[in-house]
Structure formats: structure tokens, C-alpha cells
Amino acid sequence: MQIKQFDIWLADLNPQIGTETGKTRPVLILQTNLLNKIPHPSTIICPITNNVVTEAKILRVNIPRGVANLSENSDIIIDQIRAINNKRLIKRIGTLPENLSVLVKQNLKIIMDL
């Protein structure tokens, strides 16, 4: 299984606790390819939802339907970053285009004060 930064994968995020995003859903791979190239057992991700919230500005990045092989308008939930075990990753769906990858990086810098 070759995991790459800014790929979108289907992942099983259950069980969830509290406000964590659960269910089987697309996730965006955030982790650097330096770690992705070695046998690292976990991956840093952001969950993706089809519950689009347009007024959420820096907390979400919108992915239009059809982009990266997603069948619905979707949002990357920037403030739900987490590491998951690679066994949760089911299959690769697509790759986020560069313009959206840049926006994700900008929003991460803002919410993490980097």
C-alpha cells in the first residue's frame, strides 16, 4: 500500500469518541512523504464530509463534486486532524489538486499558529 501526501483514501474511523468524526469516509492524507515512504504504522489525516458548511472558512476546505473522484460536494474538516493506524485505510480514491492542497496548508498554519 503506497500512501502519498494529499491523496484521498477511504478509511474506517469507527469507533468514534465524543466530537470525533466517525464512520467509513474519505480522508485526506496530511503526513509528509518522508514518513509515508518508510514502514510507518500510522498516518496523519483530516476527515472529509459531504455535510458542506460554507461559512466555516478556515475550518473547512471545499472539494467540488467530481474533483479527486469524489461523487459529492465535500469539505475537508481541517480542525479534526488525527493520526490513524494504517489498517483503517481501505482504498485510495484520488489526489487533491495543487490549488486545494495549498489552501489546506494555509488553513493548517492558521489553526495551528505555525
What are the residue ranges of the model-derived segments?
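Conserved functional hotspots at enzyme active or ligand-binding sites that engage polyanionic ligands
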Residues: 1-114
